[in-house]
């Protein structure tokens, strides 16, 4: 079954159209143009924002009152080896198991299609709805994420745009659609650590300083450190060394330098400044000649039970009969940028079992459920 099949629902028809556009990050491949045409027909004011090589758009419909924003990305990760795919990654096929197959089916063109169709239905049913509906869409989520949602949020905040609630279409579900929603994410703080020694001959260690030997006790202490206890919403902060490099390649040379890359995934119980100070104190304690370059990817954010989370949970219950489980696990998402506006943020999307894999796929029927969940959430918040 393909995108041209007359038996496809509006959601699946649009999902297939989006998947068939090969929008490997940071390319958009006219996905946003397709979405904007649909939104313009539904009465949205459109504001394309091309920033550097990244396509973004902001769309808004409605007047004063609370604003519910749908956020997501049109870019997808590379396909990997084409010969490993059962179907070509941009053909958008529904197989005999009822799975919509293709790059972006789960992450996150299926969600984008569900959002658009849900909003079209809601606007048709409630043309004089309360508040406003908005869309914030980027083609820079899977890449560096410098000129996408982050940059758009900065522009919106600078002109005083209001964003009360935001649903991000990331694939949050684990086994069944709606079984898990993300109501927050841990912060991500990375670093490049350089330990300087003195290069020399391995036969004359007294004339050298081996940075590997010097760094090992400090790295062991950092790895064993108890950073915090976490809380009811977040697990304890974790520290992981991801790269360790030293040496000239020769077996008879003591290296002069060691570099280590490490990362914190941290809860709201820790701060950036606090983690940095504790790391630097441990390095000083071991008498190291060190230099560290810090890189903050995002602060932790949390949406506690309230209007948005309650509406999403009630909609999932009404559509699927199941109770959703709020979670803050996993990596970072663009929700971290939107949360800086004081916005309640919830991530809700399809099952994430095959994201970024070859043969990415999602149950076609799950996208129908997701469309209805988005629709019911709109009704609860803005009807």
Curated annotation (Swiss-Prot):
Catalytic residues in the record: 75, 141
Cofactor binding description: Binds 2 Zn(2+) or Co(2+) ions per subunit.
SUPFAM superfamilies membership: Bacterial exopeptidase dimerisation domain (SSF55031), Zn-dependent exopeptidases (SSF53187)
Keywords, comma-separated and alphabetical: Amino-acid biosynthesis, Cobalt, Diaminopimelate biosynthesis, Hydrolase, Lysine biosynthesis, Metal-binding, Zinc
Positions contributing to Zn(2+) 1 binding: 73, 107, 170
PROSITE patterns reported for this sequence: ARGE_DAPE_CPG2_2
Biological or metabolic pathway of the protein: Amino-acid biosynthesis; L-lysine biosynthesis via DAP pathway; LL-2,6-diaminopimelate from (S)-tetrahydrodipicolinate (succinylase route): step 3/3
The keyword Hydrolase appears for this protein: yes
GO molecular function: acetylornithine deacetylase activity; cobalt ion binding; succinyl-diaminopimelate desuccinylase activity; zinc ion binding
Quaternary structure (record): Homodimer.
PANTHER family: ACETYLORNITHINE DEACETYLASE, N-ACETYL-L-CITRULLINE DEACETYLASE
Recorded family membership: Belongs to the peptidase M20A family. DapE subfamily.
Entry protein name: Succinyl-diaminopimelate desuccinylase
Protein source organism: Pseudomonas aeruginosa (strain LESB58)
